[in-house]
Amino acid sequence: MWRLKVGEGKGKDPYLFSSNNFVGRQTWEFDPKAGTREERTAVEEARRSFFDNRSRVKPSSDLLWKMQFLKEAKFEQVIPPVKIDGGEAITYEKATNALRRGVAFLSALQASDGHWPGEFTGPLCMLPPLVFCLYITGHLEEVFDAEHRKEMLRYIYCHQNEDGGWGFHIESKSIMFTTTLNYICLRILGVGPDGGLENACKRARQWILSHGGVIYIPCWGKVWLSVLGIYDWSGVNPMPPEIWLLPYFLPIHLGKAFSYTRITYMPISYLYGKKFVGQITPLIMQLREELHLQPYEEINWNKARHLCAKEDKYYPHPLVQDLIWDALHTFVEPLLASWPINKLVRKKALQVAMKHIHYEDENSHYITIGCIEKNLCMLACWIDNPDGNHFKKHLSRIPDMMWVAEDGMKMQCFGSQLWMTGFAVQALLASDPRDETYDVLRRAHDYIKKSQVRDNPSGDFKSMYRHISKGGWTLSDRDHGWQVSDCTAEAAKCCMLLSTMPTDITGEKINLEQLYDSVNLMLSLQSENGGFTAWEPVRAYKWMELMNPTDLFANAMTEREYTECTSAVLQALVIFNQLYPDHRTKEITKSIEKAVQFIESKQLRDGSWYGSWGICFTYGTWFALCGLAAIGKTYNNCLSMRDGVHFLLNIQNEDGGWGESYMSCPEQRYIPLEGNRSNVVQTAWAMMALIHAGQAKRDLIPLHSAAKFIITSQLENGDFPQQELLGASMSTCMLHYSTYKDIFPPWALAEYRKAAFIHHADL
């Protein structure tokens, strides 16, 4: 059986190091002797059930670690299920029992070091490049044994669409990018060209060829196929490493770009500058024949540079971008690659690119900012020195990126430990914690305190295009190292709220200087327009988006301000101002005022706010209304609050819930779930937004209906059902936060109970 291990790594591997004694580290290990017959049967049943229902519910319920943790906690749900029939009223007792059931279940899922684990996946483009990298470097069987490979195959099979392709993420329609990557991954893992479960490879290849063959794969796919030797580098738009030698004052310098894009193109520029191609094995030769519609030697690679399948093209290249690519390809790259310039300029450029790669790797303990970047950086390190320590350190951190659930083994974006813990703590605090949750809060508080980033990136970090990180919190753990404004805000909120409680309940308060550092970091991420960015201040002009080469994403070139980040920081600063009114008072007051103006300015005509990190208008409106409420805005004194409330009430479903499709994100307009289905987590978001906007004082019926939907959705063990994806990124990339369903419904019930039963009266 697979077992989730927490906080392990000390002394086991000379290439593994930590800034925090591996607190929060999550790794999976296969133990052939683990588990009773009943437990193994339960795991197999979970796998069978997922596969049989995979067309109806795409995300996993993340059952494997939950079964393990519930057993280790000796969890038994002793509070009976709450039944509410037809028009029956909700009583205080029933609301309390449903809440306590959810809190008990959530508490039992806490890890020993205080965090809440959970799957953080969704995109189907993450696992294959890892397999490609290990195949090219000759380490595939060393890193992944037969059990790993079996679960990887399970994951790929589980998420193949009926048409034979794979979507950009697990709920999307098939696209060339992920269909090609997963097809090649299956072949590398040993599946024959017509083999696989339900003829997976044959069906996938038919999809690829019927859509023009792999010359229509978007640019990132072209890079990986060129590295493998299935595509030619002359068919890739140039990304010369000399870009890193340009003066930083130039507005087009990639050092000013969005952090994820910048770090993605560091190794891509290195690979391009080297024109690296792995060993041409018999399998690669077969793939050349299988995936192209014409003989490999006859392909017009120059023409293929601009090709992209219509299914993949979310951001079509403007004409000016294609003209620039053509100029680079026709004139600049041949010059840079010629002697003696290649010995002088290119050699220096490759050294600079590798210097930046090593810097990012070291400062993230080789987790890297995300998995897309890790795979590319790891390969670049191997090319630079196959026997070097940098590559070996990358190998040691691969387990941190892997996750196992009933749908198989997948590669995570990275972890979401801190993000989940911050929300879980707020849910527990809202529930009026009792004796049985005090230890849970104490452990969570300890995890949050230990996970704060205590230093800035090493050395002259500004010359490496990095921002301060001291005082911040990451999405996952301290070792990751990448500060995020909303993660910092949620963690700081928890620390401040817990500091108001007795230390014998919640443990020692966080050091005040650490809170000051977190405030300093948050303030540094506010733009002139009042909004807060996520990772770094805005450095590039918006017109740089004209050079977005990804095809797949929008808003990929520049950092920008987000409603959710702005609201989270606003709420944290309001609490800080109340507790510590003498620290940077004028700056914080001005910051809050500007943040409010930004949130109000981002409201759309229908009263909603676009959510960049969740789906979508429901998520954004929840954050916006909570932020405005934190500063004292009400339905009566704020038009934005009124319009936001009306938007949510107008989209409430007949069953009392809310349900929004992920298509709202790319379409940038509200789209309900098919059949007007409701989603229990989105219902919780909308419900909390209305409560913070004072809905209980005006009309309780919408809240009662929502609460009834949540309560009647609760499962026997106190958990809630897994439904649609809930996370989002860059408009098209949907994310699976599996622990959301364990946190937000109880949190909403806690807020509902306080708002609806002020005097503990029945409805």
From Swiss-Prot:
GO cellular component: lipid droplet
Residues in PFTB repeats: 149-190, 515-556, 592-632, 641-682, 703-744
Keywords: Isomerase, Repeat
Enzyme class: isomerase
UniProt superkingdom: Eukaryota
Annotated catalytic residues: 486 (proton donor)
GO MF annotations, alphabetized: oxidosqualene cyclase activity
Name of one Pfam family that matches: SQHop_cyclase_C
Annotated EC: 5.4.99.-
Biological process annotations from GO: triterpenoid biosynthetic process
Record-linked PROSITE patterns: TERPENE_SYNTHASES
Keyword flag Cytoplasm: no
Function, in words: Multifunctional enzyme that converts oxidosqualene to tirucalla-7,21-diene-3beta-ol and two other triterpene monoalcohols.
PANTHER family membership: AMYRIN SYNTHASE LUP2-RELATED (PTHR11764:SF52), TERPENE CYCLASE/MUTASE FAMILY MEMBER (PTHR11764)
Protein name: Lupeol synthase 5
Gene source species: Arabidopsis thaliana
Gene name, Swiss-Prot/TrEMBL: LUP5
